[in-house]
């Protein structure tokens, strides 16, 4: 049986995260798979930044990235020590497929396929088109996860879902009762 150390981080800009010490964290924690959200950079930036950790770790990274078509927005990535066998960025409808919010990556682990998903669900604003868009995204996400489950897939969903179900999910829960992401 293979044990994997998996991490997920909303970096809110990967260059800023590296300025704040992310490279040291990666070297200290030594994850096998890292899912990133709100990358806000190009694939070349990810390759360059994570290359700085490779000597200390003794391995190179496999980098898959779904950048948003709007530069400086969203973007999700999966970095791994092991080579992926496949990846997909299509969630559907088409409006989501260019938003840099969904990335599925398959790995062969002990002869079985493990699908790792990195996703970023925007917060949405109450009673606005953004909230409608968020619910459409969540519906598409649910349909995709149902399809994966029907196939018997082993799946790990990682990301910033911007959803709080209980008081424990958010620090200031009373102040957020009427905010998107923490609605009844």
What are these model-derived regions, one by one?
Residues 1-55, 63-76:
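N-terminal, active-site-proximal structural segment of metallo-dependent hydrolase catalytic domains
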Residues 5, 62, 115, 154-156:
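Proline-centered loop/turn at the N-terminus of a beta-strand
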Residues 14-18, 97, 133-140, 182-184:
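Soluble or luminal CAZymes and related metallo-dependent hydrolases
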Residues 15, 43-45, 72-73, 124-127, ...:
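Short catalytic/ligand-binding loop motif for oxyanion handling, primarily in non-cytosolic enzymes
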Residues 23-27, 102-111, 140-153:
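Short amphipathic alpha-helices and their capping/turn segments at secondary-structure boundaries
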Residues 40-124:
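Structured beta-strand-rich core segments of catalytic domains in phosphoester-bond hydrolases
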Residues 53-56, 137-184:
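Metal-dependent phosphoesterases centered on the DNase I-like endonuclease/exonuclease/phosphatase
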Residues 92-95, 121-138, 172-179:
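Surface-exposed cleft-lining segments at the edges of enzyme active sites
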């Amino acid at each position: 049986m293979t044990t994997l150390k998996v991490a997920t981080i909303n970096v809110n800009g990967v260059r800023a995260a590296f300025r704040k010490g992310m490279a040291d964290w990666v070297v200290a924690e030594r994850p096998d798979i890292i899912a990133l959200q709100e990358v806000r950079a190009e694939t070349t930036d990810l390759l360059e930044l994570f290359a700085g950790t490779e000597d200390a770790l003794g391995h190179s990274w496999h980098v898959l990235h779904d950048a948003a078509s709007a530069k400086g927005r969203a973007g999700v990535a999966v970095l791994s020590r092991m080579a992926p066998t496949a990846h997909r960025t299509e969630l559907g409808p088409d409006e989501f497929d260019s938003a840099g919010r969904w990335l599925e990556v398959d790995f062969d682990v002990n002869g079985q396929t493990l699908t790792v998903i990195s996703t970023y669900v925007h917060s949405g604003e109450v009673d606005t088109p953004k909230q409608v868009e968020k619910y459409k995204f969540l519906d598409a996400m649910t349909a995709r996860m149902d399809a994966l489950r029907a196939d018997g897939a082993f799946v790990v969903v990682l990301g910033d879902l911007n959803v709080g179900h209980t008081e424990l999910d958010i620090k200031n829960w009373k102040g957020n009762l009427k905010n998107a992401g923490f609605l009844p």
